[in-house]
Amino acid sequence: DDRKFLHKLDLLDFPGARSREKYKEQDIHTVLPKILRRGKVAYLFNKYSRSLRISSVLFCHHNDQKAEATIGETINSWIEDNIGSTPEERANMLNDTNGIAPLFFVATKFNIDLERTKTDNSSNIDKLDTHWNRFDTVFPEIIKPNKWLDNWVKTGGLFRTAAFQNIYPLRDFYWSGKNGVFDGYSDGAVKSEEKSVHTYADYPDYFENLKQSFLKNAFVQRHFANPEQTWNDVATINNDGSKAIIRNLDAIASVLEDARKKKYLAQLAKIKSEMYNALSVYF
């Protein structure tokens, strides 16, 4: 009952998806396994995507992915085919999906963003903003050269902002405990849940200061509809961010198929009209 979306959606993983890389012919014998592996993932995604069988995408990226080859064009092509190529088209589609985009950006390893660094102390609170660098560097790198992150939908009705707002931080319970974010969790022989936020004797207000830094961050304020709720979903005891993803998957699952049919039927009607207009001059 807590995974209602599974009654409507099937899950298919495309691990390690990347865009194309360039190799010299003389190096083919050393890079062939990598080419085949990446080609297999790309082929499967493109095959399902072109047949309109991928209704939603959960794109997972970690906190330091800017050096990796990106798949911006692959994601953008899927958006154009399944949601819309303009803010107006996307708004029309999302009006039928409770305002939730079927593209989920999942910011994994968010526990790393929450970890205290060597330079974090009560005398330089302003520098805590560097914990959210992934939003200013990784995100634009992923989708470049496209600009839809800030021009996602036409405002009005369900949409109070034009910005893309379907981003979900996700952390790992084990590493949150291992690296001093929360205390109490164990997945060993004796299981236990998180008991408390880790407190530093020399900086007891660290986590509260970090929270305020998150809430005041310009990217967060623009791209999270409710920053306080997002923080509570991912950075409170025994909440790793997954419940927010499940909540919105549940909200979209029951209406997504009808919304897709409506969009594709409208596209077919447009094609029919254009063909009729083109041929009518000859008859």
Model-derived features with residue positions:
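Conserved GTPase G-domain substructure that encodes guanine base recognition and part of the catalytic core
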Residues: 37-57, 61-282
